[in-house]
């Protein structure tokens, strides 16, 4: 039987997505990664499906996740079943139109982030002023820092991240996933709105991380039926 050799480039979220961890590991990241590697290994041996991970950027991210969750020994299995490759950043061509669109998108996001910062400053100043008006005695500096500045900074960080980083490419690993997929004519596997959006812009196939294990299992099941 002739098998079309499919290629997939995996982002860190292909392993750490909450849906994947719950489905394959019942909430345990190490168990989920183990079972996903089992599927990837079988798919490679039986169907000639190849999975890649950008090196060193995404590989380093994934290594950190495994070490923090107490299963660094899984790196040897990742080295066995997943191809580590550095994207050819000098040869992969990206249309100038997409580059301009990305710059425009980031400029708009930074502008919205600046407005968020200005609003946070005004809110903090107003809250501090209202506290001092309510109190007849001098207000301790520590109280202003605790009740006003600290809370304002926490709110600002959350809103700034959502405004500037959510839904776009905000790191070198994200970009490497797309560049490697384009270089290899491979599908992207991730659970990241920014990667998904720009994968579409580049004309790349995209597979949600939560759907990837089921797809591999279906391929394996159908292969057994055809051969049997």
UniProtKB/Swiss-Prot annotation:
Q: Does the keyword tRNA processing apply?
A: yes
Annotated catalysed reactions: Endonucleolytic cleavage of RNA, removing 5'-extranucleotides from tRNA precursor
Entry-linked InterPro entries: RNA_free_RNase_P
Q: Which residues form a coiled coil?
A: none
MF term (GO), any:
ribonuclease P activity
A GO biological-process term: tRNA 5'-leader removal
Q: Which UniProt keywords apply?
A: Endonuclease, Hydrolase, Nuclease, tRNA processing
Q: Could you say which EC number(s) this protein's record lists?
A: 3.1.26.5
The lineage's top-level taxon is: Archaea
Keyword Nuclease assigned to the entry: answer is yes
| NCBIfam families, A to Z | PRK04358.1-4, RNA_lig_partner
Give the family from UniProt. Answer: Belongs to the HARP family.
Question: What function is annotated for this protein?
Answer: RNA-free RNase P that catalyzes the removal of the 5'-leader sequence from pre-tRNA to produce the mature 5'-terminus.
**Protein name according to UniProt:** RNA-free ribonuclease P
Organism of origin is: Methanopyrus kandleri (strain AV19 / DSM 6324 / JCM 9639 / NBRC 100938)
